[in-house]
């Protein structure tokens, strides 16, 4: 089958032919329709330090997808041939303390699709049926293919009650931008997002941001004054992994505020703990999606009017994958979709 793989320990990916995956007793085989390019895939493309330490070579990658079930293992229940599905990209052990307590997103033995094992940038993907998630007919293939990052945004944004709250989001990547739409959808008052990328800040405005602030040119404090915010933000969502952004977020938080961290900062990043301790801040680390509460919330929000369509900005046939990666690398894109049926 056709697949997009890392064949050499060097930058780039190669469109190649690989063996179609075998289907275990508890697996489903998915014929891929659409995939989306993730920031993780950009790390793999660049072959940075993280990728060199993490990614087996050779291996086809990718973990954001939608497709239909074409084969099932003999022990699979609850699915049928032809079901349209996406899937949870974190495959968990089922036996550790957290898995057995129903907290699978905290499994200490997590294996990542397209990171630690063969991925979705291929014509077919085999995954445990437990990880497959049926997509309702009213949700498009494009949106279904980005449920993985949409889930990151949902898990982060809904970590705390947002109704009537003032929310600061640092980092206007696709996940941060989707968090804007989620926060407004569930009833936040002011939703302010910061970055230095004008293209993505404009996308955030389209998705409902109260203010999208280029911090290279505009003061966050001035924006807070403009919005008549006298005490700081109630909820902070750190999506960038940039130390200076995290610092500014902590400084802008109100006393008793709550902070969720999805962005991954460099090791040994300095924190002004006075901001945390004397403000009584609550800080929560976010990894992946809650299984499968996050997934049900994503569907419910889309069915109740959440519009994420502006976040998909580029679409390419898989044979033009290099154009798709170029769009992502340019910084002037939202989500980039690769069509495996074209």
Curated annotation (Swiss-Prot):
PANTHER family: L-THREONINE 3-DEHYDROGENASE
Role noted for this protein: Catalyzes the NAD(+)-dependent oxidation of L-threonine to 2-amino-3-ketobutyrate.
Recorded GO CC terms: cytoplasm
Pathway annotation: Amino-acid degradation; L-threonine degradation via oxydo-reductase pathway; glycine from L-threonine: step 1/2
Quaternary structure note: Homotetramer.
Record's protein name: L-threonine 3-dehydrogenase
Protein's organism: Burkholderia vietnamiensis (strain G4 / LMG 22486) (Burkholderia cepacia (strain R1808))
Cofactor(s) recorded in Swiss-Prot or TrEMBL: Zn(2+)
Lineage: Bacteria, Pseudomonadati, Pseudomonadota, Betaproteobacteria, Burkholderiales
Keyword Transmembrane set for record: no
Enzyme Commission (EC) number: 1.1.1.103
Pfam annotation, one family: ADH_N
Cofactor binding note from Swiss-Prot or TrEMBL: Binds 2 Zn(2+) ions per subunit.
Family per record: Belongs to the zinc-containing alcohol dehydrogenase family.
Cell compartment(s), UniProt: Cytoplasm
A single GO BP: L-threonine catabolic process to glycine
Binding positions (NAD(+)): 175, 195, 200, 262-264, 286-287
Annotated disulfide bonds: none
Site (Important for catalytic activity for the proton relay mechanism but does not participate directly in the coordination of zinc atom): 148
């Amino acid at each position: 089958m056709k697949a997009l793989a890392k064949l050499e320990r060097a930058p780039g990916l190669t469109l190649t032919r690989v063996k179609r995956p075998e289907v275990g007793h508890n697996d489903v085989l998915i014929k891929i329709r659409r995939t989306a390019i993730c920031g993780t895939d950009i790390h793999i493309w660049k072959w940075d330090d993280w990728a060199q330490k993490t990614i087996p070579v050779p291996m086809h990658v990718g973990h954001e997808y939608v497709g239909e079930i074409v084969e099932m293992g003999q022990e699979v229940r609850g699915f049928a041939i032809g079901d349209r599905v996406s899937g949870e990209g974190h495959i968990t052990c089922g036996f550790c303390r957290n898995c057995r307590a129903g907290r699978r997103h905290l499994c200490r033995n997590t294996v990542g699709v397209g990171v630690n094992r063969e991925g979705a940038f291929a014509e077919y993907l085999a995954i445990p049926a437990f990880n497959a998630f049926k997509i309702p007919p009213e949700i498009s293939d494009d949106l279904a293919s980005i449920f993985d990052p949409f889930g990151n945004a949902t898990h982060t944004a809904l970590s705390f009650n947002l109704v009537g709250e003032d929310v600061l989001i640092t980092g206007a990547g696709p996940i941060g931008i989707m968090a804007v739409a989620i926060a407004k959808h569930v009833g936040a008052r002011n939703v302010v997002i910061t970055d230095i990328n004008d293209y993505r800040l404009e996308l955030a405005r389209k998705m409902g941001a109260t203010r999208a602030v280029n911090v290279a040119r505009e003061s966050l404090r001035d924006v807070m004054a403009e919005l008549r915010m006298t005490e700081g933000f109630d909820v902070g969502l750190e999506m960038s992994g940039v130390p200076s952004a995290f610092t500014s977020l902590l400084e802008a938080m109100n006393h008793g505020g709550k902070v969720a961290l999805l962005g991954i900062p460099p090791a040994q990043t300095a924190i002004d703990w006075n901001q945390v301790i004397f403000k009584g801040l609550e800080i929560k680390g976010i990894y992946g999606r809650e299984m499968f509460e996050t997934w049900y919330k994503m569907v419910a929000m889309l069915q109740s009017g959440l519009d994420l369509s502006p976040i998909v900005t580029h679409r390419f046939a898989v044979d033009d994958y290099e154009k798709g990666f170029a769009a992502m690398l340019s910084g002037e894109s939202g989500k980039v979709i690769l069509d495996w049926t074209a």
